[in-house]
């Protein structure tokens, strides 16, 4: 199994290009099911999670065409009855469940294994099912970990989400695109990836708009047509490289940044002493400059527009060498402190009580062998390795490959001493 080896102490310089957002691409691929004709997705990130959902689509019966040279994906229409994806494949990734809404909308009946993904806490699919029930679908456990859903017809409804779940918002929204009448989702997720999915669906002929933050209205249509679409940039990958500049005290240029999407990340990094410089006539790039002294700060993760839980682990690595005490409160996922033990092995002083981590900054981290416990924790350990004394070996990097395209090559191009073995 591959490992990533980082020898710390190198300053970073140069520029890095950010990929399109994994968390946009996955629901967009699922949403392609709704089209009566083919869909072309540009700037496809070559990630393991993307390959997984493509495999799910292929097991449904779709004849996908991935152009790895041009980073494009063609999803042709399915001109036969869909098949059932294997349980083993679906359990690899939670986002596999995103095909449920589109499949019910288009075919009226479907069976799917309960999904998997990072083990970062309870993420029940009940919110998804509750929303689909409100549209007229019926679900049941059909044995061996499978969920069966069917609907003679879907009818628009007013749906209130108990929590602004991104996945539930996406699934309900896609199912409602071809429901009869109007669907209103209250307390809907507000993440940029939600808006991106709306723009994608509307480009196929859907009628979806955001009336106000947290309220989405869908007017059902008879069918959706083909489209060509380019997803938004990945704000979490951009944030990861921002932290890389901050933790190493380096100056780098990041290309492919929507600064509005990253506003909470940028705000907290500025509070910690990091500087940001806009580039004239280049709104999608930014220069990030870290300083020698990292200031301690407090962070509480929240649904968007709050500070993203997907950037919590990376910030913990940064604050582990801040000059003073910091507090991180994780309010989204209860198991997102699994990287703490690994950072402690490197010399970090972190105490956890429930959903709160108290971080006492130390002068230095020391390289050792650590394990990526999930996608973002793995990236955070690479960040820690960039500034640690000696050599850091990160194992279980298949987690990292789920969400970062050749992360070691991007860091090496910036001057880091990093390799995959």
Curated annotation (Swiss-Prot):
What EC identifiers does the entry list? 2.5.1.7
Task: Give the UniProt subcellular location, in the record's own words.
Answer: Cytoplasm
Which keywords has UniProt assigned to this entry? Cell cycle, Cell division, Cell shape, Cell wall biogenesis/degradation, Cytoplasm, Peptidoglycan synthesis, Pyruvate, Transferase
The catalytic site is made up of: 118
Per the record's keyword annotation, is Cell wall biogenesis/degradation included, yes or no? yes
In terms of superkingdom, the source organism counts as: Bacteria
Tell me where the transmembrane regions lie. Answer: none
Gene Ontology terms: cellular component: cytoplasm
Positions of phosphoenolpyruvate binding: 22-23
Matching entries from InterPro entries are given as: Enolpyruvate_Tfrase_dom, Enolpyruvate_Tfrase_sf, MurA_subfamily, RNA3'P_cycl/enolpyr_Trfase_a/b, UDP_GlcNAc_COvinyl_MurA
HAMAP family, A to Z? MurA
Q: Please give the name of this protein.
A: UDP-N-acetylglucosamine 1-carboxyvinyltransferase 1
Gene name per UniProt: murA1
